[in-house]
A protein has these predicted regions:
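Catalytic His-Asp segment of secreted/periplasmic serine-dependent ester chemistry enzymes
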Residues: 374-508
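Mobile, glycine-rich extracellular loop/lid and propeptide segments
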Residues: 94-108, 116-119, 161-190, 217, ...
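Beta-strand-enriched, solvent-exposed domains that form extended recognition/catalytic surfaces
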Residues: 29-173
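Short amphipathic alpha-helices and their capping/turn segments at secondary-structure boundaries
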Residues: 163-176, 261-282, 336-368
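Conserved SGNH/GDSL esterase-like catalytic core that processes O-acyl groups on lipids
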Residues: 196-331
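A structural motif corresponding to the C-terminal end of an alpha-helix
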Residues: 220-237, 329-370, 407-448
Length: 513
């Protein structure tokens, strides 16, 4: 039996030696599938619909009623959830070398790969060879704007495959200028905790991206910038947001606003951030404080016949009546807007303070300037004027028709508490009418910010309850500055209007929020 086993094993061994060996299977040929995309310059690291920067985040409780005063992570190159804008105004870092572009070899097959990049000037650069693995198949490079040819070479042993794609590297430089309706006043990053947990005499610490200006990425321009960023992987968006609560044309946009700690005009602040880069898009909200927004509210809260009364304080002090002051200040707006236009790609720029005499900011070919009309905060859900606290419905109607309506009649009939009719001539038009008229400057007025609330059958004013798009009086609720400003719903409506006015149009889905 043992002899048979030995003989059998010998026969098997001889058979194995005598059979020809199967040829080794040839390695699969490599395939090159080059792809590219712009790395976002307006980042949303947690998908909550708001930009996250690199300016630091509270060490604890960022979105609570009272976040930690200690900030962490500033300048580490990582956008943390709920992290402030860089310097309170910049979405991400600008680099003279260009903008970050992701080169994607992940759908390719092979062992190793390199990219060869031929730039707009014809210069060629080849990246270091890397292993083609899931963790290493992506490469980020800095490239200047313009047309590039990207060639991906993939190798396996001595075999290789190369394919090229054209890449139009493009970063949209967006600048937000203006007042509280642009800065996001009343909408700090932790606004939701204030809305749900705050109350009468509550203790609340707003978490702003910029404290002096009450600036927040919950403001409409920042929301629109993020929507623009997310609209295409082939462009990135850098936001420079210098809007500041309380700003006017002279004290804010074109000059220092020392009352809010701004030693330089917004124009000069932008210049120092972007240098000689060309701007692609400007959003602008200004004029409300120029015509006496705060003075009107103060007067009408204390005087039942405020339009014919003497302004108690503020920018309209010295005018014989509130109506006369509003009309006189409205008449100054066309020249004020023209001065701003001079600084945005015009022939001369007249700013005061630091930067006086500097050249205008450079605008890119086809750049858009989007001034926003102010929303209607005066009407109840029924469409009737609000009768709010000590402000009479008649005075709400007067404010709406003589300040906000963009196509007013030539006169306005006002009825006093004594039932005495007074006819007001509107020779200077209205604030929103003057903003709409900036088409003459080559601007594109954002009318949707008005029409959504002002032309609708349903009112969304300060007395509209759950349908309101603006805060009422918040003086006793821990954030007095929010009074009579757009609430989160109102900022979203303005952001939607801004995005819709962009070319090409950008749509913000409510599901994104």
């Amino acid at each position: 039996m043992r002899t048979r086993v030995i003989i059998g094993l010998m026969l098997v061994s001889l058979a194995a030696v005598s059979l020809p060996m199967a040829p080794a299977s040839a390695a699969s040929a490599p395939t090159s599938v080059p792809k590219w995309s712009m790395v976002p310059m307006s980042k949303d690291s947690d998908g909550n619909g708001f930009i996250d920067g690199d300016g630091g985040v509270p060490s604890e409780g960022a979105l609570t009623m009272n976040p930690s005063p200690t900030f962490v992570g500033a300048g580490n190159g990582v956008a943390q959830p709920n992290e402030r804008l860089i310097g309170g105004n910049l979405s991400w870092y600008l680099d003279q070398a260009g903008y970050p572009v992701r080169l994607d070899a992940c759908d390719s097959t092979g062992d190793r790969y390199t990219w060869t990049i031929v730039g707009p000037a014809g210069t060629s650069t080849t990246t270091s060879e890397r292993a083609l693995k899931k963790k290493t198949c992506g490469t980020t490079v800095l490239l200047p704007e313009g047309s590039h040819t990207l060639t991906l070479r993939v190798t396996t042993g001595k075999k290789s495959d190369s394919k090229a794609v054209k890449a139009a590297v493009s970063n949209i430089l967006m600048v937000a200028l203006g007042d509280s309706y642009a800065s996001g006043e009343g909408n700090p990053r932790n606004v939701e905790s204030w809305l749900t947990e705050g109350g009468l005499l509550s203790r609340f610490t707003p978490y702003w991206d910029d404290d002096p200006c009450n600036r927040s990425t919950h403001g409409a321009p920042a929301q629109a910038a993020l929507a623009l960023e997310q609209s295409s992987p082939k462009t990135s968006v850098t936001l420079v947001d210098v809007a500041c609560s309380g700003a006017t044309v002279a004290a804010g946009v074109l000059g220092p606003f020392t009352a809010f700690g701004q030693s330089k005009s917004q124009i000069e602040q932008v210049r120092q951030i972007i240098g000689d880069r060309q701007i692609d898009l400007v959003t602008l909200s200004v004029g409300g404080n120029d015509v006496g927004f705060a003075s009107v509210l103060t007067a009408c809260a204390s005087d039942a016949n405020c339009p014919i009364g003497v302004p108690p304080r503020g920018i309209l002090t010295g005018y014989p009546t509130l109506q006369a002051g509003v009309q006189a200040r409205t008449a100054q707006l066309p020249a004020a807007y023209a001065r701003i236009a001079g600084c945005l790609g015009g022939t001369s720029c007249s700013v005061t303070g630091p930067g006086a005499g500097s050249a205008p900011l450079r605008m890119a070919p086809g750049a858009q300037i989007l001034p926003t009309l102010y929303p209607d905060i005066t009407r109840a859900p029924s469409g009737a004027p609000c009768d709010y606290l000590t402000i009479r419905a008649a005075n709400m109607a007067w404010a709406r028709d003589t300040t906000l309506v963009p196509n007013p009649a030539s006169t306005y009939e006002y009825l006093t508490t004594a039932r005495t009719p007074v006819t007001f001539p509107l020779t200077s038009g209205t604030l929103n009418q003057q903003i709409a008229a900036t088409t003459a400057l080559g601007w594109t007025p954002v009318t949707g910010s008005w029409s959504a609330s002002g032309d609708s059958a349903e009112g969304h004013g300060i007395c509209a309850g759950e349908r309101a798009w603006a805060f009422g009086l918040t003086a006793l609720n821990g954030m007095s500055s929010a009074s009579f400003h757009p609430n989160p719903a109102g900022q979203f409506v303005i952001a939607t209007a801004l995005a819709g006015a962009m070319t090409p149009t950008v749509i913000i889905s409510p599901a994104r929020r």
